Amino acid sequence: MPLLNDLLDFSDHPLMPPPSAQLFAEHLPTEWIQHCLTLSAHATVRRRRLPGDMVIWMVVQNEPITDVVRRLNLSADGEAGMNLLARSAVTQARQRVGAAPVEWLFRQTAQDRGAERYLKDDWHGLQLFAIDGAQFRTPDKPELREYYGSANTSTKRQNAYPVMRLVALMNLGSHILLNAVTAPYRQSETVLAHSMLATIPDNSITLFDKLFYSEDLLLTLNQKGCNRHWLLPAWKNIASEMIELGNTASPGTIPKRLEHLRGALEVVFITKRPRPSRPRSVKISKTRYPVKHSAAPLK
C-alpha cells in the first residue's frame, strides 16, 4: 500500500496542517502536499503517530521540528503523557518521507510564486533578482566529510566540521527563492550559479557579488534570454572603455557652478584670506606665565 493510502486511512482529514501552520496553509495548496507525498519511496501499512503530511508541514515551519512536536503534542489520539512522541520518532519520520517530496514542494512553489510581480516591483521596467552564495557547517560525520569536504587551516589540520556550499537565486521583491543548489566546499560558486541561469525570467536584472565576475557566466545570462541584464560591483583597476558619457558638466565650469550653488551663503565661505601687513608674532599670557625680570638670562 502506498504511503498516501496509509495517510488516508489514518484519519478523515489527513492533509489538514497543524494549527500553528495555518499561515502556510493559506499559500500552499493541499494538492501539492498530496502530490509530493506520492514521491516518497517508502511504503507502509502501519498507523503512524506522525503521518507524512505532518512531517511536510513541520519541514516548512521556520523552527526546530522537535519544538513543534513537543508544543503541538502530535500523536494518534492527541493525548499527553505516555503517548508523547519520542525524539527519535521525528527523525525516523523525516527519513521515511525522504528528500524527494520536500524538494518537489520547493521547486513547485518557486516555479509558481517565484516570478510573480508586485506593485513597484520593477526598476526601469525590469524585475530585480539576486544570486549569492553562502557556506554552512554540517554534522561531523565521515560520509559528510568525504562528500562535502572542509576548509583548510593555517596548520596541516582541517576544519573541525564539513562545510557545504550553497548558491541561491532570490526575487528581491518578494524574497522568494527561485532556485538553490548545494555542492561540496571545493566547488566554485560561479559554476553553481551558471547551472541556474535558465531559471531567471526575461525582462529582468540580476545582482551579483564581485566574486561572480566571470565572462562566461555574464555573457550567457545576457545572450541566452530576452532583455536580461546583470549588475555587479566593479573590480579595482578594472580595464574599461567609455562608450558614452551622460549629460555632465565640463570640468572647466565646475568653479562657476560651485559659486552659483553657494547663493546667499557666501558669508559662510572664505573666498580669500587677507594677508597681514606685518609679520605674525606669538604673545605670552602675563597671568599664566609671569615674567621675572630679575631672573638670569638664558644661555
UniProtKB/Swiss-Prot annotation:
Transmembrane segments: none annotated. Disulfide bonds: none annotated. Residues 276-291 have a biased composition (Basic residues). Could be the product of a pseudogene; missing an internal segment of about 130 residues compared to orthologs. It comes from the Bacteria. Residues 276-299 are annotated as: Disordered. InterPro entries: RNaseH-like_sf, Transpos_IS4, Transposase_11, Transposases_IS4_N. It comes from Escherichia coli (strain K12). This is Putative transposase InsZ. One of its GO terms (biological process) is DNA transposition. The lineage of its organism: Bacteria, Pseudomonadati, Pseudomonadota, Gammaproteobacteria, Enterobacterales. The gene is insZ. GO terms for molecular function: DNA binding; transposase activity.
